């Protein structure tokens, strides 16, 4: 079968022929329909410092997908061949304190598909049946293909009560864009998104952000004054940029709450005085709550949330290089590749 493989220890990704995997007793073989390119895939493609520490060459990458059940393991029940599914990309151990305590999204033994084990940029893949998420008929496959990052956005946006609140989102990547839309959809007052990429800021505005701010041209404090704000009640840090995080700390209202998804460089500093004396809450976010986030984000789409607005490109798998080029240049929202 075809698969996108990180074959060499340098920039690039390679379309190769690899064996079709065989499902174990508790696994399902999935025939992929569509897969989306994630920022993690771009890191692996670029072979940055994180990738060099984490990825073993020969890995099939990818973790955002939708497909149909092709074969059931001998012990699997509750699914049918041909059923359309996505899946939680974090495979957890099931026996640690957090898994047994109902917090599997915090499992310290988590294995990520397309990072630690072979992933979804392939014609077929295997997944534990317990990780599957059935996709309702009303949701098109091109949207279901990126439920994984949509779930990251939903986890962040729903971590704190944003109804009637002023929300600052630093970083207008696809997750930040989607989070802006969710916050407005559920009743936030002002949602302000910052970045330095005008293309992606436009997507955030289209998704419903009250104001988008290119911080290389406009002062966030000036925007706050225009909106008659003393500070932000909730912050969603999506950029992984220490300067953006420190700007957020500076602009938070006393008692504000911050959800952090962006990964900061090792050793990055922050102004701890602002966290302490403003009484801020800072919550790390990793992945999606299993499976409460999946339920809520599915219902959001079914209730009219315009997830389609972040989808900018659909390409056949043979044009994967174009997709990675668009992502590297920052000239795309979500890019979905088709295996059909």
From Swiss-Prot:
Its EC number is 1.1.1.103. Pfam families: ADH_N, ADH_zinc_N. It catalyses: L-threonine + NAD(+) = (2S)-2-amino-3-oxobutanoate + NADH + H(+). InterPro entries: ADH-like_C, ADH-like_N, ADH_Zn_CS, GroES-like_sf, L-Threonine_3-DHase, NAD(P)-bd_dom_sf, PKS_ER, Zn_alcohol_dh. Binds 2 Zn(2+) ions per subunit. It is found in: Cytoplasm. The keyword Oxidoreductase applies. Pathway: Amino-acid degradation; L-threonine degradation via oxydo-reductase pathway; glycine from L-threonine: step 1/2. NAD(+) binds at residues 175, 195, 200, 261-263, 285-286. The keyword Oxidoreductase applies. One of its GO terms (biological process) is L-threonine catabolic process to glycine. The record marks 148 as: Important for catalytic activity for the proton relay mechanism but does not participate directly in the coordination of zinc atom. Zn(2+) 1 binds at residues 38, 63-64. One of its GO terms (cellular component) is cytoplasm. GO terms for molecular function: L-threonine 3-dehydrogenase activity; zinc ion binding. The active site is at 40 (charge relay system), 43 (charge relay system). Keywords: Cytoplasm, Metal-binding, NAD, Oxidoreductase, Zinc. Its cofactor is Zn(2+). Zn(2+) 2 binds at residues 93, 96, 99, 107. Catalyzes the NAD(+)-dependent oxidation of L-threonine to 2-amino-3-ketobutyrate. Belongs to the zinc-containing alcohol dehydrogenase family. Homotetramer. This is L-threonine 3-dehydrogenase.
């Amino acid at each position: 079968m075809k698969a996108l493989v990180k074959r060499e220890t340098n920039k690039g990704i390679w379309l190769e022929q690899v064996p079709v995997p065989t499902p174990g007793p508790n696994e399902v073989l999935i025939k992929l329909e569509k897969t989306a390119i994630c920022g993690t895939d771009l890191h692996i493609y670029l072979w940055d410092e994180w990738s060099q520490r984490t990825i073993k060459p020969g890995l099939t990458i990818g973790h955002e997908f939708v497909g149909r059940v092709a074969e059931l393991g001998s012990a699997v029940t509750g699914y049918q061949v041909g059923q359309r599914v996505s899946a939680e990309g974090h495979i957890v151990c099931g026996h640690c304190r957090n898994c047994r305590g109902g917090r599997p999204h915090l499992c310290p033994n988590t294995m990520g598909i397309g990072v630690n084990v072979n992933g979804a940029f392939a014609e077929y893949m295997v997944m534990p049946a317990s990780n599957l998420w059935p996709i309702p008929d009303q949701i098109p496959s091109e949207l279901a293909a990126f439920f994984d990052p949509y779930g990251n956005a939903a986890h962040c946006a729903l971590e704190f009560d944003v109804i009637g609140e002023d929300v600052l989102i630093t970083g207008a990547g696809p997750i930040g864009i989607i989070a802006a839309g969710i916050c407005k959809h559920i009743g936030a007052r002002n949602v302000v998104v910052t970045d330095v990429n005008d293309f992606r800021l436009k997507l955030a505005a289209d998704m419903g952000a009250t104001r988008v701010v290119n911080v290389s041209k406009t002062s966030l404090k000036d925007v706050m004054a225009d909106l008659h704000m003393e500070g932000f009640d909730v912050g969603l840090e999506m950029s992984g940029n220490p300067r953006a995080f420190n700007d957020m700390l500076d602009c938070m209202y006393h008692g504000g709450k911050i959800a952090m998804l962006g990964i900061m460089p090792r050793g990055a500093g922050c102004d701890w005085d602002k966290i302490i004396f403003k009484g801020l809450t800072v919550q790390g976010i990793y992945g999606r709550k299993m499976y409460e986030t999946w339920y809520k984000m599915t219902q959001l789409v079914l209730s009219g949330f315009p997830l389609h607005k972040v989808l900018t490109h659909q390409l056949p798998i043979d044009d994967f290089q174009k997709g990675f080029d668009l992502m590297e240049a920052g000239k795309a929202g979500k890019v979905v590749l088709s295996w059909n």
